[in-house]
Amino acid sequence: MKKFIAAAALSVGLAALAAAPAFAALSASVKAPEFVAQASLAGKEFTFKLSESLKKGPVVLYFYPGAFTPGCTIEAYEFGEAMEEFTALGATVVGASGDDIAKLHQFAADNKACNGKFAVAVASPADIKAYDVAGRAETRSNRTSYVIAPDGTIMSTLSSGEPTGHIANALLALKAWRERNPITPAAATK
C-alpha cells in the first residue's frame, strides 16, 4: 500500500511538472525584435525605442511578471543597485511587464524597486509574444533577461523564475562583450 501511495504521489508530481509552463525564450545570436513602448523613468513618461537605445550601446531588456510583486521588486532593486556597473559598461537597462503605465510610474520611482535608476516599460501582448516570454496569461510575462548588442543581436538570455541571478548574468555577458569591444576615446565622446 505504501508503494502504491508513493507511486501515486510521484505520478501526480510529474504531471504537475509537465503542466507547469516552460520558459521559452529567444536564443542568443538571433536578432531581437523591435521594442517600442510607453516607459517611465523615475515616474516620468517617455517612449522607449530599442533601436534608438542600441545606437548608444548594448541594452539589457528584462521581462518580469508584475510590478510590486515580491520577486519583481527584489529584481528591480538589484538592477538599480548595479546601475553604476551597467553604465560603466555602456549599457542601458529597461524592465518590461504587462502592467499599465500608471503602475509603472509608481514602480519606477519607488525606492524599494527601481528607485528612479532605470526605466520600466509597458510590454504589450504582442511584445510578450515576440520575445517568447508569455507567462500563464498573454498579458503577463515570465522572468527573462536579454542582453542585446548594439547591432541588435541577442548576446545572452536567462529565463528563470528566481529574481536573483539575472543581474550577475547580464553583467558577465556585458563584460565579455566589452572585452571584445573596448570603449575608445573617440567613442566615449559621442
Region roles according to the model:
Residues 50-73, 77-79:
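Short active-site neighborhood of thiol/selenol oxidoreductases, capturing the structured segment around
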Residues 140-190:
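Thiol-/selenol-based redox modules, centered on thioredoxin-like
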Residues 1-12:
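Bacterial N-terminal signal peptides that target proteins for export
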Residues 14-39, 185-187:
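N-proximal helix/coil linker or "cap" segments that precede and/or mark the start of modular domains
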Residues 94, 107-142:
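Short, internal strand/loop/helix patches
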Residues 36-58:
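A short beta-strand-turn-helix
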Residues 33, 58-60, 142-144:
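Short loop/turn microsegments at loop-to-beta-strand junctions
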